[in-house]
Amino acid sequence: MIRVLESLGRDFTIVFITGRWAMGQAKVDAFIDNLLPNIKKIVFCKPHDYPGTTAEYKLAQIKELESDGYKFYMGLDDHSAVIGLLHNHGMFVAKVISD
């Protein structure tokens, strides 16, 4: 993972979109900052009062970010058959590979 990040250079932002974490947004932010210091990142933690599923929340956040000009290239989820970067429903988002 570190090699992938190093090959990207410094002109990128990692977006984490997570499900409901009992610890709350502030602790999720601190947890991810501790994992990846000195790397630009945005963290979205699904609020407890969000009416939809975690998948719906993640897709809604991606659509909103894309409308703000972000470009997503790859999406990885811990429940994916491919790879997991965070436990407990964490997701590193850069492009949703499939609907």
Task: Specify the residue positions occupied by each region the protein language model found.
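Short, acidic loop-to-helix structural element flanking the phosphoryl-transfer center
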Residues: 1-15, 22-26, 56-59
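Surface-exposed amphipathic alpha-helices with a cationic face
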Residues: 5-9, 63-66, 87
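Conserved beta-strand termini and adjacent loop/short-helix elements that scaffold enzyme active sites
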Residues: 17, 45-46, 96-99
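Substrate-recognition "cap/lid" segment bordering the active-site pocket of phosphatases
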Residues: 22-71
